[in-house]
């Protein structure tokens, strides 16, 4: 089940509300990534404390480890990971296609060697839907081929991107058919592909909308933009985003997959995106790269050795309320696990507060003012 209410707009920016089987999600929203069933360095209680409404799990990795039988014993992924709010799972396609020489793509699906033990495995639209049904995620992603930006060290040609996109469209239909056959009570999202080529993006979206229409408008609960932030220049990412996002069906949520920086999130919301996910805030946190209202901080740098200030005096997260830059610098230098935890709490809090601020700005029809202030604050740099 997915009900989406578009509450108000400000330009192309949208303020919405998704009602899913495990709860309500206020949009626009950022989804922390829990690849193996855990958001790195964070407990479910901590995620709720910083305002996480929905988290993402990885179908491919959870299928391989711990295996579906283990998750079945917990009545699905929510019970296994101890999270009672909504969850989204990807289809596993991106991870399979990232295996390079270890995989072979056919019309039926993808044959590949397990990165864990080398076993020969096969993943198809049907199998992906069956796995995600057993995981019981609130939002299920269609099985697709993520068109790479580069093939053999050069940008993908339009013909290569077209072949990949059309394969994804055929797989979208098969995903939809299997989702229906499984009687999955959750929501299926289609994924717009087409590389850096606007006409191919248009063709992909039209094909997904045809599948949706054939199911009486119930074919897809939402629409995602895939194949961005895969190595392309930033200007190409923004160009494709600004072309596709306004064309997505207005009555369904819009999801920009795998993106990105704080600036990317603001640009995405300005273009009409409702949902984001990215490993950046958690990965950067573990590496000591911290996001603040006034720019980024590399906490390992010597300049922070004796600094008694919090990371961001305007931030209300647990880390900023209780610890100094000097202490976080020390933890990073000596490799203490607590450092990774405190950094992650801060970065995810920053991302989620950024989304909350954008929701408020859209509600008050002051998003343009917010966006200008955001850019000026970030450009100032952390002092």
Curated annotation (Swiss-Prot):
Any one GO biological process: tRNA wobble guanine modification
Class of this enzyme: transferase
MF term (GO), any: metal ion binding
Superkingdom of source: Bacteria
Membrane-crossing residue ranges in chain numbering: none
Keyword tRNA processing carried by entry: yes
Span list, region RNA binding: 258-264, 282-286
Role according to the record: Catalyzes the base-exchange of a guanine (G) residue with the queuine precursor 7-aminomethyl-7-deazaguanine (PreQ1) at position 34 (anticodon wobble position) in tRNAs with GU(N) anticodons (tRNA-Asp, -Asn, -His and -Tyr). Catalysis occurs through a double-displacement mechanism. The nucleophile active site attacks the C1' of nucleotide 34 to detach the guanine base from the RNA, forming a covalent enzyme-RNA intermediate. The proton acceptor active site deprotonates the incoming PreQ1, allowing a nucleophilic attack on the C1' of the ribose to form the product.
Family: Belongs to the queuine tRNA-ribosyltransferase family.
Listed name of the protein: Queuine tRNA-ribosyltransferase
Organism field: Ralstonia nicotianae (strain ATCC BAA-1114 / GMI1000) (Ralstonia solanacearum)
Name of the gene encoding the protein in the UniProt record: tgt
């Amino acid at each position: 089940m997915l009900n989406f209410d578009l509450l108000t707009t400000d330009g192309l920016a949208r303020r919405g509300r998704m009602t899913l089987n495990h709860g309500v999600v206020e949009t626009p929203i950022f989804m922390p990534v829990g690849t193996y069933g855990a958001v790195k360095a964070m407990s479910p209680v901590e995620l709720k404390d910083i305002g996480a409404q929905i988290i993402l799990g990885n179908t491919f990795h959870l299928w391989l480890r711990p295996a579906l039988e283990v998750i079945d014993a917990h009545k699905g992924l929510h019970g296994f990971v101890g999270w009672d709010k909504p969850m989204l799972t990807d289809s596993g396609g991106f991870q399979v296609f990232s295996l390079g020489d270890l995989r072979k793509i056919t019309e039926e699906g993808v044959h590949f060697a397990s990165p864990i033990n080398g076993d020969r495995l096969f993943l198809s639209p049907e199998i992906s839907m069956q796995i995600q049904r057993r995981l019981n995620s609130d939002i299920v992603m269609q099985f697709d081929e993520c068109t790479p930006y580069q093939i053999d060290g050069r940008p993908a040609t339009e013909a290569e991107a077209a072949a990949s996109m059309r394969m994804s469209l055929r797989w979208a239909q098969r995903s939809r058919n299997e989702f229906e056959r499984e009687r999955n009570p959750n929501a299926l999202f289609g994924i717009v592909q087409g590389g850096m080529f606007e006409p191919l993006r248009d063709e992909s979206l039209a094909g997904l909308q045809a599948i949706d229409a054939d199911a009486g408008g119930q074919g897809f609960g939402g629409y995602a933009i895939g194949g961005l932030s895969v190595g392309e220049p930033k200007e190409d990412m923004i160009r494709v985003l600004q072309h596709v996002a306004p064309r997505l069906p207005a009555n369904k949520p819009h999801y920009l997959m795998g993106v990105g920086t704080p600036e990317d999130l603001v640009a995405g919301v300005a273009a009409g995106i409702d949902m984001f996910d990215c490993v950046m805030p958690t990965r950067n946190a573990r590496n000591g790269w911290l996001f603040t209202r006034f720019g980024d901080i590399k906490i390992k740098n010597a300049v922070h050795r004796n600094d008694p200030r919090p990371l961001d005096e305007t931030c209300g997260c647990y880390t900023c309320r209780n610890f100094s830059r000097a202490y976080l610098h020390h933890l990073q230098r000596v490799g203490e696990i607590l450092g990774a935890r405190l950094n992650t709490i801060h970065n995810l809090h920053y991302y989620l507060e950024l989304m909350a601020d954008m929701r408020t700005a859209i509600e008050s029809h002051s998003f343009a003012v917010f966006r200008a202030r955001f850019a000026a604050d970030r450009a100032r740099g952390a002092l």
